[in-house]
Amino acid sequence: MTRIRRGYIARRRRTKIRLFASSFRGARSRLTRTIIQQKIRSLVSSHRDRDRKKIDFRRLWITRINAVIRGNRVSYSYSRLIHNLYKRQLLLNRKILAQIAILNRNCLYMISNEIRS
Amino acid sequence: MSQQLARTRLAYARTWHHLSFATDPRPLGRIASSIALHLMGKHKPIYDPSTDCGDYVIATSCADINTTGKKRYQKLYYTHSTRPGSLKSMSMDNMFKKWGGGEVLKKAVRGMLPKNRLRDKRLARLKVFEGEDHPYRKNVVKIDGKTVNNDKIGHSGETLDAVLQMKNELPPEKVGVAQAST
């Protein structure tokens, strides 16, 4: 059998992966074996965090709405607001309520006063 | 998109809140809880845990801190220097005598802040004084002689809405004005 070199097969595969990790810091964008591992880790992170993102933002909106609602009246809270929202079947979601809280706080107060029965 | 709304210097500017224990009858823990919320910035609609968006709090007359029950003489503060046998305790009354009410308040607030890298920075924004005098009078903003506190850290705090309503910037409805009852 004549000797056969592998040629450029492996190099082409590794270049693609290297391009993916081209903006990583330090050895993670320079060393081939490290690059392969870091690409796997980063894809796992992005897969997991796509679902975490939805959870995290909802938590942030709830905190922000709570902050503004508690500033208005002594014994009012986010939980009571949501209860009244559901009782009156108002379809505003937390994302929109949080944006209203930032941009137009009085509008949120008006809404909460209206639905407060 | 909610991360980019209201990214203005004015929104993130730190405001100074003033609180006097001489006029506030609430006990130590309840006030400390309210102070911790303000140091974290959780009273703001732009709150984000990754940024330190907290405010300054000036607490005066800390010698008059009110505690219920016999806590003043029975509550013990422990210190340990990691050397075996060096557990020391001090009652709250002795803490008042040795370090002052400011330290008692700071210990209370410190336990109520999230235990992360921002805790000491936030605690440093709490300025405590035993008497009524403090060097930050110019930092506390006043409109028409009323302190602009947009929240309830003071006992019967005038809200920003009440102040703005005085200046006819809000419609004269019940919108947003603090109701003393309920």
UniProtKB/Swiss-Prot annotation, chain A:
Keywords: Chloroplast, Plastid, Ribonucleoprotein, Ribosomal protein, RNA-binding, rRNA-binding. Its main location: plastid. GO terms for molecular function: rRNA binding; structural constituent of ribosome. It is found in: Plastid, Chloroplast. One of its GO terms (biological process) is ribosomal large subunit assembly. Pfam families: Ribosomal_L20 (PF00453). It comes from the Eukaryota. GO terms for cellular component: chloroplast; ribonucleoprotein complex; ribosome. Binds directly to 23S ribosomal RNA and is necessary for the in vitro assembly process of the 50S ribosomal subunit. It is not involved in the protein synthesizing functions of that subunit. Belongs to the bacterial ribosomal protein bL20 family. This is Large ribosomal subunit protein bL20c. The gene is rpl20.
